[in-house]
Amino acid sequence: MDLFEYQAKELFAKHGVPGIQGRVTDSAEGAKTIAMEIGRPVMVKAQVKTGGRGKAGGVKYAATPEEAYQQAKNILGLDIKGHIVKKLLVVEASDIAEEYYLSFLLDRANRTYLAMCSVEGGMEIEEVAATKPERLAKVSVDAVKGVDLACARSIAQQGHLPAEVLDAAAATIAKLWELFVAEDATLVEVNPLVRTPSRGYGSSGKILALDGKVTLDANARFRQPGHAEFEDRAATDPLEWKAKQHNLNYIKLDGEVGIIGNGAGLTMSTFDVVAYAGEQHGGVKPANFLDIGGGASAEVMAASLDVVLGDVQVKSVFVNIFGGITTCDTVATGIVKALEILGDEANKPLVVRLDGNNVGEGRRILAEANHPLVMLVPTMDEAANKAAELART
């Protein structure tokens, strides 16, 4: 789960990473009010979950509240790499002496963690890697030992950070590692990590995280209940949101045939045969991808049907199940009970194809139930064709 910058900064503050918080608004008038309360020049920053905001005109300096209002007006509604700006972060502008780069991420290729650090911050890190690879340090991190101050200092040194900021930078790097581990993140990035101008003899300025990017591991949600508040429900399709609450793998599409399968491979194959059959029936298409995985209990099946039937475009549903550990009779019982649970909400024809473990018993259960909406079809091709035909009528 990618976070907005302001959410990343909330985690920075929680773990003691120095930075400037700012406030969030969804209007130009709100930006003006925040700027007035800050009483100093501000930065008006688009909140979108993608990079390249500055180049796209999504980050602007404003010397006065009136300028903040105008900049906010220009940024709101901006399309940045397909992301429409709906929220802004208004922060006090900071004096900058130098800009650095720092990140922690999963190195999947080498099955370890990776720290990246560079004295060349404030620009796209891909550009640094391509044009000045010697200025970008890539340091493997031992998952057991982690990052203490000595390791953090070494990372900063390898990134060619100046000697006078090593101690302060190391303290910040160690705190960012603490955040990375404690919050079950897969990416923590600061670009730029800045040094402010020195303010007198012996001062090397402050180290501040002026921008932040954090990606949280959605698979760790069970031990991170607080992360639910970061979910952007407004940007999520309501049906996908409902499916997520039931731990269903659901992706909404634009077709007319709802699909429920068990296992990603079978569900994708079902998608293909429905798409092919649809070409023979006026261009009917799959309406979704929904993989119920290994569990097809009545509750799971009811939740799945509730989600699929909630799509007003759906005209028929193809339930394609291969019985393995979860047997066909268990699935059939789940379908019957699910239809009882849903009652009148189940109002579209269901084409069911069962195969595999206990298929005979599963078919018998559905046949005896004799539900008016259920059509039991023996093969996947026949079932796809029937579902497409029903969706067209």
Swiss-Prot record:
EC number: 6.2.1.5
Binding site residues for ATP: K45, G52, R53, G54, S94, E99
Pathway recorded for this protein: Carbohydrate metabolism; tricarboxylic acid cycle; succinate from succinyl-CoA (ligase route): step 1/1
InterPro entries, A to Z: ATP-grasp, ATP-grasp_succ-CoA_synth-type, ATP_grasp_subdomain_1, Succ-CoA_synthase_bsu_CS, SUCC_ACL_C, Succ_CoA_ligase-like_bsu, Succinyl-CoA_synth-like
UniProt binding sites for Mg(2+): N191, D211
GO BP field: succinyl-CoA metabolic process; tricarboxylic acid cycle
Cofactor detail note: Binds 1 Mg(2+) ion per subunit.
Signal peptide: none
Domain ATP-grasp span(s) in chain numbering: 9-242
Entry binding sites for substrate: N262, G324, I325, T326
Top-level taxon of origin: Bacteria
Homology family: Belongs to the succinate/malate CoA ligase beta subunit family.
Family matches, as NCBIfam families: PRK00696.1, sucCoAbeta
Name of the protein: Succinate--CoA ligase [ADP-forming] subunit beta
